[in-house]
């Protein structure tokens, strides 16, 4: 059974309109809420990430989800499960990393328990205020597709770390200490007057595009040459796959009306249809939503 199958089962059982985006939009309270977990030997290895970096990343992956909703990140709570062998300095450095990542976002409490491996679960709360909140269901034919951040860097950095390498430093840094696209999110959500779709690219750019396409009942047409990436990833022969499927870059991709696209990087347009069409060197390649799903990381393989 695949991760998506589990999610669909949960949706069927709960039958809640709040489920479907990375954040739950609680309109009556004026907030969005999200939760994400990091598990040792699934999402990270202590052989190549420091406690400070782990704390930083744990905060940023959740702040990124809030940014994808368009809300302002405000609070985090942290549930931390640790083996008995962990020393106090690990916890100190972990929380220093979280605090550094959070900036004005306040860590408002949490829980700590024992476990066989390190398990981190973070809940993040965002304030909506006068911002318009996104939904992956809101893409419409004619919308322009805009993007923030380089893509492929984190996946390349992960490969290098697995090979015991520490350079290029920009790729290592991208994997260990990602940065949420706070200003990009604020600029869109504070100025847009119409519904729009936005997701972060934590599971890969192709995944985000496919998820929006499927939820909105549209197709995404992308000009591959417009996607921003760090040239350092060209050390890998399949760097183009890393750009689309690498994941953990925590950029944002949005489908928005053309009139607000000034000063943003446009990589394509929403069309009628389904799946993703990629324009590359005068050729077109089409990926169905199912084909994209098959190429992505699956927790339950």
Regions found by a protein language model. Give the residues of each.
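Extreme N-terminal cap/leader segments of soluble proteins
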Residues: 1-50, 69, 74, 78-79, ...
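Short, compositionally biased
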Residues: 156-173
């Amino acid at each position: 059974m695949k991760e998506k199958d589990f999610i669909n089962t949960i949706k069927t059982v709960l039958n809640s309109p709040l489920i479907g985006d990375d954040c739950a939009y609680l309109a009556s309270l004026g907030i969005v809420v999200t939760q994400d977990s990091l598990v040792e030997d699934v999402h990270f290895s202590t052989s190549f990430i420091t406690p400070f970096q782990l704390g930083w990343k744990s905060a940023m992956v959740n702040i990124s989800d809030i940014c994808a909703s368009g809300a302002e990140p405000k609070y985090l709570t942290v549930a931390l499960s640790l083996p008995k062998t962990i020393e106090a300095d690990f916890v100190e450095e972990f929380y220093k990393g979280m605090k550094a990542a959070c900036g004005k976002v306040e860590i408002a409490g949490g829980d700590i328990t024992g476990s066989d491996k390190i398990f981190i679960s973070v809940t993040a709360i965002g304030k909506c205020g006068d911002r318009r909140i996104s939904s992956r269901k809101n893409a419409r034919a004619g919308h322009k597709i805009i993007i923030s951040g380089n893509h492929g860097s984190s996946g390349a950095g992960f490969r290098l770390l697995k090979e015991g390498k520490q350079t290029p430093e920009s790729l290592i840094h991208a994997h260990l200490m990602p940065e949420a696209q706070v200003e990009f999110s604020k600029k869109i959500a504070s100025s847009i007057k119409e519904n729009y779709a936005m997701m972060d690219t934590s599971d890969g750019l192709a995944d985000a595009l496919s998820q929006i396409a499927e939820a909105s009942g549209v197709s995404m047409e992308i000009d591959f040459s417009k996607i921003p990436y760090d040239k350092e990833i060209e050390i890998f022969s399949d760097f183009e796959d890393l750009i689309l499927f690498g994941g953990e870059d925590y950029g944002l991709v949005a489908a928005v009306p053309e009139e607000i696209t000034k000063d943003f990087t446009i990589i394509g347009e929403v069309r009628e249809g389904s799946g993703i069409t990629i324009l590359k060197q005068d050729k077109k390649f089409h990926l169905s939503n199912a084909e994209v799903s098959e190429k992505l990381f699956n927790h339950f393989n």
